[in-house]
Amino acid sequence: MSFKHSVRDSWLAASYAVGVSELYKKLWGRKRGIISYHNVLPLSKLPHFDTYNVDQTVEVFEKQIQFLQKHFRILPIQELGNPKAEGFFITVDDGMANNYSLLAPILDKYDISALFAVCPALVNGQYPHIWRDHLFLLLRQYQHQPIWLPFNHYREPLQVGINGETLNKLTRKLKKNVYEQQVADIYGLLKEICQKNEWSYELSDDEPLRYQFMNWSQIQDLHRRGHSIASHTMTHRVLKFLPDHEKQYELIESKKHLENQLGTSVDTIVYPYGSLAEIDESTIAIAQEAGYQLGLMNIQTHSLSHPMLALPRFAFPPIDTPAHLHAIASGYKFLFR
């Protein structure tokens, strides 16, 4: 941790202890917020290969929920479309198996309803993993041999270390390359990497809770229990890189699939990744044409034309310290960037 962050964290802890952050919350704090989660895992400590920092332990997740209920107000997810509703909403992205077996029971324990965003094509098995997870799993499985990657048009192999941090850095580097090249067919790129390295595209899955998806019966059961289901597109590709007809497939077909499976209307789209690097005005226009009423991002932006289709969210890191959770939820922390 840098000296700057150490000083900031000490100040946040002191502010919480003497009530300064609580005063900020009452006078100027965030009155409404949408919180994003992804995975909740049955571990005492998260592994260092959480490449995208989207995982929580069961224990920490439950403590975060307890904290929110004590200090803030968690609203029923059915109120999400009401702009006057003040409080916090819980959303969960990707539809992984742990969402059903571990995360949802904690929500049920505290009588909380949430929004689960799923990708129908991934539930149906069109692809075995979200591309970013598949990429990491491939690198992890074959890390002890030279690896050919598209950075230099496969001209020279890379020797990857056995350290998980090295794998994380390489995975992020590949993701950066995808963004720089604006790769639309990301799953095709994964198959190309496998062909160049003579790897099997299919992987043995020893972590089903983390890398496998819920099935339709589980998703339908969540809906019956009072949770809401949203589209997370069909395949979790980067929407901004796609031509309009592919965006239409991702947004319109996912909505149709979900409505057929659930027997009800689906009016919320949760954009994968959720920043302006992945979402453009064309995406918003197609979402509106598809009939979505709400669109969730991961940032605050005023540059897109339809505010209700570009609602901001925030996330908690995997911590349970009250001072930091309070500072993030209230917005107090962001005074000290």
Model segments located where?
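CE4/NodB-like, metal-dependent polysaccharide N-deacetylase domain
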Residues: 84, 96, 105-117, 169-201, ...
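Long, hydrophobic, well-ordered secondary-structure blocks that form the structural core
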Residues: 91-134
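Short, well-structured alpha-helical interface segments that form or flank functional binding sites
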Residues: 63, 98, 102, 214-217
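Alpha-helical segments flanking ligand/cofactor-binding loops in enzyme cores
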Residues: 105, 220, 284-285
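Extended, charge-rich helix/loop segments that form flexible
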Residues: 27, 36, 128-225
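C-terminal active-site subregion of NodB/CE4 polysaccharide deacetylases
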Residues: 1-91, 98, 126, 130-138, ...
